[in-house]
């Protein structure tokens, strides 16, 4: 058991970056009430299933219930009177923010400003170096094992092809029948952000590197997808990549940027897509706002997110040029 599997083993977390209560480090959100929901369920707080392991051990996946219980408690403790709120997360937590964004919005009156921020969670369904879809295989296992259907936005599920049913059935019954007829493939598609964001109605900010270090290491070039140590040095530090390897990374970037077109076209959404070799930028001071923070349009991430959330600029959508064009990308940024 690890800290990800039990709250008994969780270690203390330092509140830095977007979580900081220091004005200098977090000028726009330093005086907000901040709650961190520690990641522990393995499916971005989406699962709701129980089953049996091969040895007869009972397995319970309750991420969705954990999410609902935490939000219920926060509402009871005063969040119900909030005038502004931001649901955010990084990596798997970023995917959770997307999955639950509209649900979070629905908890509040319409005159409350609710927005979402997704940091380093724009996972793409791309083939790895061997031609396999390693990330798809992993996510498919999660979708199947944890029964994530109830957490997926109904708008996304509604866009998938249902089993043909009689047209005279009422819409509510039709939708129930439709849900029951969805294939695992349909559920899998709605777990990937490229499909997921199409049905999110709440204003959302996508913060991501288009050379995301976690995806390059675990989805594009996972161990076993290449011979020997051919990619080890490149995966450790993008500055070590050969021109041939960079061509492959540029291809990864091209697909990620193309899938962000949906977000780019959405009114009230924001983008900060840098070309730094990093993963998770908002929770760390060095990335969020510091002397060596990545900058796009001469804005740090903190400034761009603040401009977007508080409407200081009409549009906040930055997409970087290809690596290594951005001189503000530092080798000291966090990777995973």
Model region roles, listed by residue range:
Residues 1-336:
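C-terminal His-loop and adjacent cap/lid subdomain of alpha/beta-hydrolase
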């Amino acid at each position: 058991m690890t800290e990800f599997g039990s709250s008994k083993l969780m270690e203390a977390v330092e509140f830095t970056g977007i979580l900081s209560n220091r004005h200098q480090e977090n000028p726009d959100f330093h005086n907000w009430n901040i709650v961190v929901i520690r990641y522990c369920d393995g499916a971005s707080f989406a699962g709701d299933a129980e089953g049996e392991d091969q040895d007869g051990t009972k397995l319970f996946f309750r991420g969705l219930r954990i999410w609902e219980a935490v939000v219920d408690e926060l509402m009871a403790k005063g969040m119900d009177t909030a005038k502004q709120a931001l649901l955010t997360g990084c990596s798997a937590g970023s995917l959770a923010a997307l999955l639950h964004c509209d649900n979070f919005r629905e908890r509040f009156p319409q005159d409350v400003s609710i927005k979402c921020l997704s940091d380093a969670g724009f996972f793409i369904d791309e083939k790895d170096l061997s031609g396999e879809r390693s990330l798809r295989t992993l996510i498919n296992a999660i979708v199947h094992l944890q029964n994530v259907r109830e957490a997926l936005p109904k708008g996304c599920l509604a866009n998938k092809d249902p089993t043909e049913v009689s047209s005279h059935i009422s819409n509510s019954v039709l939708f129930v029948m439709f849900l029951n007829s969805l294939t695992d493939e349909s559920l899998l598609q709605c777990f990937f952000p490229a499909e997921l964001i199409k049905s999110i109605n709440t204003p959302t900010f996508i913060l991501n590197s288009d050379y995301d270090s976690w995806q390059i290491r675990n989805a594009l070039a996972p161990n076993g997808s290449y011979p020997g140590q051919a990619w080890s040095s490149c995966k450790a530090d993008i500055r070590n990549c050969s021109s041939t390897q960079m061509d492959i990374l540029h291809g990864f970037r091209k697909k990620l940027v193309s899938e962000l077109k949906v977000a780019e076209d959405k009114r009230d959404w924001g983008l900060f897509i840098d070309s730094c070799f990093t993963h998770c930028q908002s929770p760390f001071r060095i990335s969020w706002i510091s002397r060596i923070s990545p900058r796009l349009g001469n804005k740090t991430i903190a400034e761009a997110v603040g401009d977007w959330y508080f409407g200081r600029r009409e549009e906040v959508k930055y997409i970087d040029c290809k690596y290594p064009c951005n001189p503000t990308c530092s080798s000291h940024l966090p990777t995973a």
